[in-house]
Amino acid sequence: VVSQYFWPENFRINDLVKEWVQRGHEVTVLTGIPNYPAGKVFDAYQAQPSAFATYEGAEVVRVPMLPRGRGGLRLMLNYLSFVVGGGVIGPLRLRGKPADVIFVFEPSPVTVGLPAVWLGKIKNAPVVFWALDLWPETLAAIGVVRSHRVLAWVGHLVRYIYNRCTLVLGQSRGFL
C-alpha cells in the first residue's frame, strides 16, 4: 500500500489494511510521518516512532516528509516531500521485499501516485490506484488554482500516473 496518510491518522485505508491482514495477506504500507490534519507531527510519534512500525499485523514503512503546516506553499512542499521520500527512500527501505500488487490510496493529492508507479516498475508489480479526489478538477472547483497552464500541467501529471496504473478505481460513477 502506498498512502501519504496512514494510522494514526484517521483514514479509510486503515480499515482496508486491517481487513486484508485478517484475510491472510501480508501487507506493507509505505507512508509518511503522521501530521494530518493539524499539520504538525503527532506528539506520540515523536516520542516513540518505533511504536508506529506495525499496524494490526501490517508492516508500516515511513519516509521523511515535511509536515503540512499552514498555507499553500507549505502544503505543496508537504506533497512534494512525500514524492521525494516515497520515490527515493521508499524503494531503498523496501529493497528485497517482493510485491504482488501496489495499492495506492489517494484522498488527495494525486502526487501520491508517483512513488507508487515508480515502485511498481521497480518491483514489476501491477499498480491499482483508488482515486477519491478528481485532479485537476478539484483544484479548479475550489479555486486553489486558477492558472490554466498550471491546471493543464496537473492534467498531464494525472494522465502520466493513470496511464502507468493497471487499474484506476473511482470513488463513484461520477468519476468515470
Language-model region placement:
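N-terminal subdomain of nucleotide-sugar transferases
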Residues: 1-56
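An aromatic- and histidine-rich active-site surface loop
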Residues: 10, 76-91, 99-132, 136
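Residues at the starts of beta-strands that form the adenosine-phosphate
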Residues: 26-28, 59, 126, 167
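A short, charged, and often flexible helix/loop element on the N-terminal side
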Residues: 56-88, 143-146, 150
